UniProtKB/Swiss-Prot annotation:
Name listed for the protein in its UniProt record: Adenylyltransferase and sulfurtransferase uba4
Sites where the protein binds ATP: 99, 120, 127-131, 144, 188-189
Organism annotation: Aspergillus fumigatus (strain CBS 144.89 / FGSC A1163 / CEA10)
Residues passing through the membrane, by range: none
Record GO biological process: cell budding; cellular response to oxidative stress; invasive growth in response to glucose limitation; Mo-molybdopterin cofactor biosynthetic process; protein urmylation; regulation of pseudohyphal growth; tRNA wobble position uridine thiolation
Enzyme Commission identifier(s): 2.7.7.80, 2.8.1.11
Length: 493
């Protein structure tokens, strides 16, 4: 028994040594092939002068202007001339020309990639300009891809820029992806993220994926190395990391949650860096470079953390041997990404009687005393359920701030200690509103008119409508409608 164990150990050691030798030979072959490529590209030609003398002039693999432009990065040992030639031959696709796509495209174009494709169906808005650094005020209203390419051509005219002025669809994605070597996911919604990852896996393209919200960001290099479907040695895909999409109502956009420009810029720059590494580095060894998730938090120490990711899932819907997602299901539309990720809906939709437009609110509750001697309605209470940071930006006169997050974190209905006790109301509810003597109407307002409906339901569950004797409703359309109907100077953010 002991001899068998020794034999097994010896065989394992020999296998390990042989594999190490093989890896070294592969590396030597790669270096030799690179040297041969440089020699093939650095040819000579004979020029005959007027006096009949001949001179040999060397033709260099890069243009003279390119040596000057890229010289500072070419002297970096990890890049070199061969790395620059690989960049020039590379075809990179960026999906999304926003906060992530702009800095990623900026640095990839500056680095000298040969072809840069940009996919985005949106147009430039003023609210984009603080973070989407390729766009300018004069390009508001134009397609983002056109605005971005205009800037990039000024930066570096050598690459070929290809615009795709539309949002990515399952039917069109394979036809676009097939022409590129690597893909960058710079989008901001789960459905598109799954689509990009699936297409990249099915076509064997490495994928650099990033996201950013508020002051935090995440980065992953997926499907790297890009092995065929069913090959467990390939890098994991987006579905391997997130087999189930997040609940639709939990997805927060930059418009709702906010974003700090340098945060999303950092993640976009890191995407460009990872893309350059994939393009210029030798073939990756999965065991030597395990996949990881990089987490960036601008207000934490340290700023960066790394979490190791698992390998490909054995039951993954796209990269396992039993995959249900194929190029055919993409093209025929049977893979429904919107259905898979779900659609965010209101938790509770109010009836028309529970809603009031800003115009009607002003008619019911004017500041001035009616000149016709008409009856003055009861003084309303306005509850603004936006988060405090938004309330501090702008608020309606005499409104009180009770954030929707605070309302939802409390019990939805009052509880009694005993049969004769008063209901136990939440701490955030002002005493004057909870008073049994108060019958003044309550109007709830938010940014767009969605959270206010949920808040009205909660307030009624707490009994603030006095069984229907007191009006509790929301201002329909929120402060966006207030700007449109009442005050055109109301801050729009």
């Amino acid at each position: 028994m002991e001899n068998l164990e020794q034999t097994c150990a010896s065989l394992r050691a020999q296998i390990a040594a042989t594999e190490a030798q093989l890896a070294g030979l592969k590396r030597e072959l790669e270096i030799a092939e690179q040297a041969a490529e440089v020699k093939a590209q650095s040819t000579t030609r004979t020029i005959t002068a007027e006096d009949g003398k001949t001179n040999e002039t060397r033709e260099w693999p890069l243009l003279s202007e390119e040596y000057k432009r890229y010289g500072r990065q070419m002297i970096v040992p990890q890049l070199g001339l061969q790395g620059q030639l690989k960049l020039r031959a590379a075809r990179v696709l960026i999906v999304g020309a926003g906060g992530l796509g702009c800095p990623a495209a900026l640095y990839l174009a500056g680095a000298g990639v040969g072809t840069l494709g940009l996919v985005d169906g949106d147009t430039v808005e003023n609210s984009n300009l603080h973070r989407q650094v390729l766009h300018s005020s004069k390009n508001v209203g134009t397609f983002k891809v056109d605005s971005a390419i205009e800037y990039l051509r000024e930066l570096n005219p050598h690459p070929t820029y290809v615009p795709y002025r539309a949002h990515l669809t399952p039917q069109e994605a394979p036809g676009i992806f097939k022409d590129y070597d690597i893909v960058l996911d710079c989008t901001d919604n789960p459905a598109t993220r799954y689509l990009i990852s699936d297409t990249a896996v099915l076509l064997g393209k490495p994928l650099v994926s990033a996201s950013a919200l508020r002051t935090e960001g995440q980065l992953m290099v997926l499907n790297y190395p890009p092995r065929p479907v069913g090959d467990k040695s390939g890098g994991p895909c987006y579905r391997c990391v997130f087999p189930k999409p997040p609940p639709a109502n939990s997805v927060v956009s930059c418009a709702d949650g906010g974003i700090l420009g340098p945060v999303v810029g950092t993640m976009g720059v890191l995407q460009a860096l990872e893309a350059i590494k994939v393009i210029t580095s030798p073939a990756v060894n999965p065991s030597a470079s395990p996949p990881s998730l990089l987490i960036f938090s601008a207000y934490s120490t340290p700023l960066f953390r790394t979490i190791r990711l698992r390998a490909r899932r054995a039951n993954c819907a796209v990269c396992s041997a039993d995959a249900s997602v194929t190029l055919e299901t993409l093209k025929n539309g049977s893979t429904d990404y919107v259905f898979f990720c779900g659609v965010a809906g209101l938790e509770a939709t109010l009836s028309p009687e529970e809603r009031i437009s800003p115009l009607e609110f002003k008619k019911r509750h004017p500041k001035e005393v009616p000149q016709d001697g008409g009856r003055i309605n009861k003084e309303p209470t306005i509850i603004d359920v936006r988060e405090k940071v938004q309330f501090d930006i702008c608020s309606l006169e005499n409104s009180i701030n009770i954030p929707i997050s605070t309302i939802l974190s409390s019990a939805s209905s009052p509880t009694n200690v005993d049969a004769n006790a008063q209901p136990s109301l939440p701490f955030w509810l002002p005493r004057e509103l909870a008073s049994a003597d108060s019958t003044d109407p309550i109007y709830v307002v938010c940014r767009h008119g969605n959270d206010s409906q949920i808040a009205v339901r909660r307030l009624k569950e707490l009994g603030l409508d006095r069984g229907g004797q007191r009006y509790v409703g929301d201002i329909q359309g929120g402060l966006r409608a207030w700007r449109e109907q009442i005050d055109p100077d109301w801050p729009e953010y």
